[in-house]
């Protein structure tokens, strides 16, 4: 990190921030300029359309000196921020139920391609939690198995698919929901 950077911007490089709204505002521009975060994360509340999303991410980058991690939380199924923009993606559990590693990878690749098309370079997925009965109400179709070996097999292929599309993946949840 350059020596002339202040402590505040160095701390900012540890943060990925979310915000309200679907367009750049003076308040958001000021926040980005002041904090200089490592990235931004958009949720459904920020995504109204493909062009709007791409524009918003480009506008965010204009206020930050270093390349941003442009992040989204997208798994398919119940956690699908692009549903209204590009259509629904199947849930991880639905894809896992096929037993096809090729489909696990394709699931990641298709999600990754949609991410890239909208301007994202990071997806907060896949879910690495185990599908225990006690966590079923929170995870439902998001967790693929109660067997760690099966979870790893799905996650490995999903992440390869994201990588094939030029998107970084980030396994979650820590310390865990299941």
Located regions from the model:
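Short, compositionally biased "basic patch" segments
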Residues: 1-7, 172-177
């Amino acid at each position: 990190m350059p020596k002339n950077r202040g402590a505040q911007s160095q701390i900012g490089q540890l943060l990925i921030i979310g915000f309200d709204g679907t367009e750049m505002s003076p308040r958001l521009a000021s926040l980005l300029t002041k904090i200089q975060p490592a990235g931004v994360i958009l949720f459904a509340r920020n995504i109204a359309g493909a062009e709007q999303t791409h524009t918003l991410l480009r506008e965010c980058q204009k206020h930050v000196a270093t390349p941003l991690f442009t992040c989204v939380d997208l798994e398919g199924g119940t956690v699908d921020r692009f549903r209204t923009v590009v259509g629904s993606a199947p849930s991880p559990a639905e894809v896992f139920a096929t037993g096809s590693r090729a489909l696990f990878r394709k699931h990641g690749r298709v999600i990754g391609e949609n991410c890239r098309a909208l301007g994202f370079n990071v997806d907060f997925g896949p879910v690495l939690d185990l599908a225990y009965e006690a966590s079923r109400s929170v995870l439902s179709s998001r967790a693929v198995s109660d067997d760690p070996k099966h979870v790893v097999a799905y996650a490995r292929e999903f992440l390869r698919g994201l990588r094939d599309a030029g998107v970084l993946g980030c396994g979650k949840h820590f310390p865990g929901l299941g």
